[in-house]
Structures are given as structure tokens and as C-alpha cells.
């Protein structure tokens, strides 16, 4: 498309008020024009306004200067925080709004668990939430505290969210995990429902891919300079034993991952690792190896359910190594012929794992939730899916 045509079209949309434009100065002082769809423009402005509202209000509970609580909690749980972890907990006591960011294995979960134990005696109403059911389930497992999805916290329904500025949340402390996954629209709805006197802690990895929806909320909040930020960069010993963690940090630093330990035919007696690299360039052979690994080698070595505990990721839909072809091959191998239903060139069978791809507020099932087909009726074209435990 010719750039002049594109600019002309944008100008016309701006005149018709179908787009919004905002002028800003970038880091080098050069003025730039940002173009938004109106609903995202309004949502982004409300996010900023609500952050300022919460920051500039008195908290329900004041912890300022009570740093002795940290040492008491350390003795209570038998844990010695490292200096940066301690800085994060001190900041949580001192500030109304805080961002804690760090890569895998840097102790984010440990800090959340520690803060919950420290603050709960003084703040009985604490809300812990994440953008997806799987993320919320993971928090519950690692902290021992009940967590929910943001949608469930806001009491989502087909009529919208029941919690808002007029009917705010009850919690005095709200902790959001996996904040990098939250898009501008959802953050807007969430912050609208946060009471002015509540404390807010946003936890996440700013170096992860941004949300699927519009916006890079966590990054923008950090770069705004208005919210205290604690960055965790130390990989703890247990995490340092994980090849996934080590290689994730290598990729982040622009380094080549450690491929020194490859899966070999004679590795039956070798120690179990969480990261392997298999070198292969032939697409058909890649599929063969994926099938072998997912249905035999890895489930047997690690005692995993090949369907519910295993996930194959691919960057494309089409082609031999695309998701459509791989799903068919995996289905044939893991869940062979039975009662099935065909829809849009996709064959569904009882026992298949499926993923919800859009929010269903009436059924309280949300985008990204995983379930398993428990019944299908080819005559009525109906599938019955049992989703994981409600969170």
C-alpha cells in the first residue's frame, strides 16, 4: 500500500472520529503522533487515571516503617530473603501500588507467598488473581492461597462485569500475577473496580511476549515512571538447575541457548533434564519425532499423561509442522477411532483435549481454558466438554 494513500485514509478516519490521535514526545524528545481506535484510547486513559487515583489515596492499612515485620516473618517461615527480595517486600509495605518483575526462577512466587503470610494478619481481605485459569491454578498450587481469574474476580456475566466503580471489589489488597498477559481493555475493567484505598501489587515478567489483546500494559506502566518497580535478576539455586530457566535467561540476553545435552539413543541411564534439543530439518521427520516424544519417550520417562500433561507448540497453522496437521497426527496416535464429530475440517473425539477460544460468561469458561471432551453426539452436532476445576 502506498504510504500517501495510507496517511490519507488515516486522516479521513480521524476527521470522521473513527480514530483518535495523540501527540507525544518520545525518549529522544521528538514529537510523534499516536493513532488509536477510540475504545482503546479511552481504556488507556482510564488505566492511567485509575492508577493515579489509587496511588494518591490513603490506604486502608498503613505498614510504613514497620520493617521489623519482615524479620519476624523470616523467622516464622524459616526463610532468609536475599537483598532484592527484601527490597520488594519493603516496597510492598511502603507503597500503595508496586510492580515486581523478573524472569523465571528469580523468586517472584516466593515473594508473593512471603507477603501473603506477612500481611494476612493485618489485612484479612486479600484478592489474588491472574488473567487465565491455568495461571490462577498455578498460583494456588505454589502459594497455598486461593486465586481466581480476573473475570471471576470481577463477577463476569453476559451483562458485563458486576464489579465496577459503582460496585467496587471488597479486598484491601489485590495481587495480580502474570500481569504481562493482561491487555489494556481487561486492565481498564479491573482498575475501574479497585477501591481507592486498596493496595495493588502487579507481578509479572516484562520481558515475556505482550498480551494477545491490544496494549503492553506492564511495560507501559514500568516505563511511565509513576509506579515503584522492583526488578528481580538473581536466579536461585533450585531454578539454576533448570535448563529451561537457564536458557530462557540466555535468550533474553541475546545469547545462544545451551544445547550441550541432546537426547541420544543411549541416554536411558542419564539424569532426567527439563530441556532437550533435537536437531532435525526434515519436516516429515520432525513430525515423527514429535509423535515419538509425546506419546512414548517423555510420558514414560517423566510419568506424564500424554494428553493432559503435554503440549506441543508450533508457530504456524498450515504445513506439515503446522498445528492443523500435528493435531490430526497426535489425535490418531493418542486417541484413535471412536465416536467423533466433524466440524470445519476438524475431527473431535471423546477424550480429546480442547481449548476455549472465546469468553463465555454464562458458562464461566474463558479464552485459554483447557478441557476434555466427555461426550459427543454426531446427530445433534453437540460436544460436552469437562473443563478443569473452576477457578
Residue positions per predicted region:
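Short amphipathic alpha-helical interaction segments
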Residues: 2-14
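ASCE P-loop NTPase motor cores of helicases and related translocases
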Residues: 7, 20-174, 228-237, 244-280
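Conserved nucleotide-binding/hydrolysis modules and their immediate coupling elements
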Residues: 77, 183, 327-391
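Catalytic P-loop NTPase motifs of RecA-like helicase/translocase cores
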Residues: 154, 182-183, 209-210
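Short basic/glycine-enriched coil/helix segment immediately N-terminal to the Walker B
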Residues: 159-172, 183, 188-198, 307
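Walker B catalytic acidic pair
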Residues: 178, 204
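Conserved helicase motor core of P-loop NTPases
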Residues: 206-354, 360-362
Amino acid at each position: 500500500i502506498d504510504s500517501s494513500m495510507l496517511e490519507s485514509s488515516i486522516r479521513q478516519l480521524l476527521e470522521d472520529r473513527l480514530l483518535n490521535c495523540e501527540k507525544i514526545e518520545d525518549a529522544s524528545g521528538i514529537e510523534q503522533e499516536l493513532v488509536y481506535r477510540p475504545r482503546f484510547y479511552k481504556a488507556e486513559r482510564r488505566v492511567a487515571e485509575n492508577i493515579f487515583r489509587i496511588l494518591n489515596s490513603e490506604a486502608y492499612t498503613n505498614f510504613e516503617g514497620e520493617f521489623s515485620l519482615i524479620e519476624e516473618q523470616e523467622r516464622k517461615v524459616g526463610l532468609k530473603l536475599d537483598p532484592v527480595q527484601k527490597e520488594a517486600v519493603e516496597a510492598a509495605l511502603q507503597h500503595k501500588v508496586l510492580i515486581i518483575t523478573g524472569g523465571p526462577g528469580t523468586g517472584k512466587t516466593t515473594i508473593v507467598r512471603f507477603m501473603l503470610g506477612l500481611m494476612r494478619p493485618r489485612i484479612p481481605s486479600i484478592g489474588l488473581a491472574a488473567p487465565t485459569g491455568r495461571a490462577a491454578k498455578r498460583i494456588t498450587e505454589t502459594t497455598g492461597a486461593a486465586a481466581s481469574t480476573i473475570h471471576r474476580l470481577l463477577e463476569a456475566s453476559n451483562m458485563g462485569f458486576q464489579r465496577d466503580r459503582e460496585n467496587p471489589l471488597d479486598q484491601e489488597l489485590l495481587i495480580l500475577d502474570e500481569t504481562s498477559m493482561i491487555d489494556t481493555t481487561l486492565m481498564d475493567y479491573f482498575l475501574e473496580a479497585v477501591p481507592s484505598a486498596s493496595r495493588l501489587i502487579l507481578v509479572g515478567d516484562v520481558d515475556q511476549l505482550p498480551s494477545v489483546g491490544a496494549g503492553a500494559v506492564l511495560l507501559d506502566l514500568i516505563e511511565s515512571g509513576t509506579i515503584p518497580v522492583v526488578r528481580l535478576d538473581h536466579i536461585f539455586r533450585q531454578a539454576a538447575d533448570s535448563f529451561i530457566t537457564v536458557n530462557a535467561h540466555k535468550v533474553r540476553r541475546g545469547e545462544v541457548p545451551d544445547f550441550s545435552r541432546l537426547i541420544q539413543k543411549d541416554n536411558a541411564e542419564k539424569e532426567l533434564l527439563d530441556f532437550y534439543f533435537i536437531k532435525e530439518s526434515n519436516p516429515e521427520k520432525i513430525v515423527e519425532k514429535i509423535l515419538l516424544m509425546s506419546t512414548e519417550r517423555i510420558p514414560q520417562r517423566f510419568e506424564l499423561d500424554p494428553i493432559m500433561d503435554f503440549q506441543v507448540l508450533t508457530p504456524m497453522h498450515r504445513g506439515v509442522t503446522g498445528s492443523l496437521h500435528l493435531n490430526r497426527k497426535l489425535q490418531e496416535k493418542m486417541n484413535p477411532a471412536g465416536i467423533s464429530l466433524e466440524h470445519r475440517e476438524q475431527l473431535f473425539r471423546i477424550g480429546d483435549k480442547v481449548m476455549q477460544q472465546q469468553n463465555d460468561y454464562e458458562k464461566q469458561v474463558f479464552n485459554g481454558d483447557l478441557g476434555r471432551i466427555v461426550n459427543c453426539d454426531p446427530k445433534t452436532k453437540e460436544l460436552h466438554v469437562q473443563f478443569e476445576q473452576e477457578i
